[in-house]
Amino acid sequence: MSISKTRQKLVDVARQLFAKNGLESTTMNDIAQASGKGRRTLYTYFKSKEDIYYAVIESELERLSDQLDEVAAKRIPPQEKIIELIYLHLSMIRETVVRNGNLRAEFFRNIWMVEKVRKNFDDAEIELFRKVFREGKEDGEFDIDNVDLVADITHYCIKGLEVPYIYGRIAHGMTEEATKPQVAKIVYSALGKRVKS
């Protein structure tokens, strides 16, 4: 097995164990045994349980980042891309947290640890928003004076919605499809885009 495949297998096994048993209850030995690798192999890749926890979070964020990149590359109008990016970000974060079971509590308890690992993802997402906003501005779709500022604000607004969205506290009882027109109206008006009635 190649170095990257071995490392990825260790990360996948660790994610499953963290989700099932929690971070505190999972040992490095548990990860080594469940992966069918020796402790020496595990310690070759990761110095500590925290290192492998960071790798699990990074792996989850890479999944999200890849999907956001796919949306940004679509040949659709920039105003549609922004709405799709917003909903994809929120739904993928919720799916990741829910899918990881016991890791969910750890995610919220160690938010500063998660923030440290998230920095690269956050920077990449802001750059993605800049690209889409520039595209919309150049096409005359958005009336934006400062693309960088609008990209920062958009990213941090979405990030601020993550926890309430995960807990289902936003648009309680409404479907995603029912909320999209209202969200689009708010976003488009902020971007200087007229909504056609």
Where are these regions (language model features)?
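Amphipathic, non-transmembrane alpha-helical scaffold segments
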Residues: 11, 53, 57, 61, ...
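Hydrophobic alpha-helical connector segments
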Residues: 55, 59, 69-95, 150-154, ...
